[in-house]
């Protein structure tokens, strides 16, 4: 017997969201009461744009480090297959506003302060596709997203 499963992100109407934004997807509790929060960190407007793989890959590696420097509890930050943003999984209770501030600060550092030497995991030994990176593209996208402003509401522009 096949279990009926609803995947929340496929239920979201991608035509009415207004990127860039941070959206709380879900808050779940483990068997011992541990809280996990899942965020939609949408950097570009769905079905209108996407970040090319090399730039997104470099942003992914940088966010893995920069988010952890700014807030406790990060489990994982993984890119969407559609290349419009990331799932951010966190331990504990966090608000969309708190996460939007962390993302904004991280993107500001990518746009203005990061050099190639700062990008973690760019060697054959540390990355499964180490040749597919672009700091230039990561910086360009980060600045574009900052210029648009990051909202803590996916449906109306409430820029933090």
UniProtKB/Swiss-Prot annotation:
<keyword id="KW-0673">Quorum sensing</keyword>
<comment type="similarity">
    <text>Belongs to the LuxS family.</text>
</comment>
<feature type="binding site">
    <location>
        <position position="61"/>
    </location>
    <ligand>
        <name>Fe cation</name>
    </ligand>
</feature>
<feature type="binding site">
    <location>
        <position position="57"/>
    </location>
    <ligand>
        <name>Fe cation</name>
    </ligand>
</feature>
<dbReference type="GO" id="GO:0009372">
    <property type="term" value="P:quorum sensing"/>
</dbReference>
<protein>
    <recommendedName>
        <fullName>S-ribosylhomocysteine lyase</fullName>
        <ecNumber>4.4.1.21</ecNumber>
    </recommendedName>
</protein>
<dbReference type="InterPro" id="IPR003815">
    <property type="entry name" value="S-ribosylhomocysteinase"/>
</dbReference>
<comment type="subunit">
    <text>Homodimer.</text>
</comment>
<comment type="function">
    <text>Involved in the synthesis of autoinducer 2 (AI-2) which is secreted by bacteria and is used to communicate both the cell density and the metabolic potential of the environment. The regulation of gene expression in response to changes in cell density is called quorum sensing. Catalyzes the transformation of S-ribosylhomocysteine (RHC) to homocysteine (HC) and 4,5-dihydroxy-2,3-pentadione (DPD).</text>
</comment>
<dbReference type="GO" id="GO:0043768">
    <property type="term" value="F:S-ribosylhomocysteine lyase activity"/>
</dbReference>
<dbReference type="InterPro" id="IPR037005">
    <property type="entry name" value="LuxS_sf"/>
</dbReference>
<feature type="binding site">
    <location>
        <position position="127"/>
    </location>
    <ligand>
        <name>Fe cation</name>
    </ligand>
</feature>
<dbReference type="Pfam" id="PF02664">
    <property type="entry name" value="LuxS"/>
</dbReference>
<keyword id="KW-0408">Iron</keyword>
<dbReference type="GO" id="GO:0005506">
    <property type="term" value="F:iron ion binding"/>
</dbReference>
<keyword id="KW-0071">Autoinducer synthesis</keyword>
<keyword id="KW-0479">Metal-binding</keyword>
<dbReference type="InterPro" id="IPR011249">
    <property type="entry name" value="Metalloenz_LuxS/M16"/>
</dbReference>
<keyword id="KW-0456">Lyase</keyword>
């Amino acid at each position: 017997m096949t279990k009926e499963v609803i995947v929340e992100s496929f239920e979201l109407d991608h035509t009415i969201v207004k990127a860039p934004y941070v959206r709380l997807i879900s808050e779940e509790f483990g068997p011992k009461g541990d809280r996990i929060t899942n965020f939609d960190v949408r950097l570009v407007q769905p079905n209108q744009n996407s970040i090319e793989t090399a730039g997104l890959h470099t942003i992914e590696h940088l966010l893995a480090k920069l988010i952890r420097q700014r807030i406790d509890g990060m489990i994982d930050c993984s890119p969407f297959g559609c290349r419009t943003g990331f799932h951010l999984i966190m331990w504990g209770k966090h608000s969309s506003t708190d996460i939007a501030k962390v993302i904004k600060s991280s993107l500001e550092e990518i746009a203005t302060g990061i050099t190639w030497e700062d990008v973690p995991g760019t060697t054959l030994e540390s990355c499964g596709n180490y040749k597919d990176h672009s700091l230039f593209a990561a910086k360009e996208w980060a600045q574009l997203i900052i210029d648009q402003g990051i909202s803590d509401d996916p449906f109306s522009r409430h820029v933090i």
